Amino acid sequence: LAHGIVFYFDDFLFPYLRSAIGLNLKFAIYNLIIFKFCSVVSLLEIINMEMDISWLSRTSLLIGEERLRSLTQKHVMVVGLGGVGSFAAEFIARSGIGKMTIIDGDVVDPTNRNRQLPALATNHGVSKALIMEERLKAINPELQLNVVKEFVNPEMVKQQLSYDPDYVIDAIDSLTPKITFLKLAYESKVKVVSSMGAGAKLDPTKLQVVDISKTFNCPFAQQVRKMLKQHEIRKGIKVVFSPENPIKESLMLTDGKNFKKSAYGTISYLPAVFGAVAASVVIRDLIGEKI
């Protein structure tokens, strides 16, 4: 369009002004037209890209519009959309984050219905990532959402981390892919908060946010620490964990599907609280609050 304006000037107006102005002035006018037009277009693009935050008026009232708008410019990745990750992803979306990546290759199983946000009696066998995609976009239609319907593997993780997320929530509940992800995230120096075990426990008031090296009374965290040490990683990963004594009788051996050889019993609310705490770490850190 800018060049069309210039052509109009050249074909119709310039002949009449040929005797009055020189070539230098002609090109100066060309440049002025293009510069002004591009400036207007850039301004319109910025206006169009700015997320509508009117639905976040209660959040703005709490943290202020400036910090809220800063959240709309952030990219948060949630890996694992089970009992912890599904709730964490929803809380992140409801905070006004502008861009998200969600990753999970699993489908809904009937046993998920006691604790997982996507799981209903009507959607057994459906991709958790697909269900969460529809839900998050229904919460915020302007959300830039990248959906990865895959289980964690090194190549995929490297690719996703290359997109420079501002924060990552690790809600993977199987040890091998969890260690794969944490190792690569640690090496890439991306900010991570990782969920430890929500199984075999009942008390949501016991949850803490600490460095991985400070965890105790959590069999899952113990295994994570042990496997990370094999990669020379002993500290430097922020985690959500519960020091509540685990109910060991709730342990169940499994068939090893999806890298899980065992599982603990779970209660409906506790994984959601883990997800809420993880989401709170991300949001508070991104707006400059002390964790």
Task: Label the model's feature ranges.
Residues L1, F9-L13, L17, L23-L25, ...:
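Short hydrophobic targeting helices and cationic amphipathic motifs
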Residues L44, M49-V76, P110:
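N-terminal charged helix/coil linker that caps or initiates catalytic domains
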Residues V84:
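Hydrophobic/small residue at the entry helix of a nucleotide-binding pocket
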Residues R94-K99:
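Conserved S-adenosyl-L-methionine
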Residues D104-I139:
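Glycine-rich phosphate-binding loop and adjoining beta1-alpha1-beta2 segment
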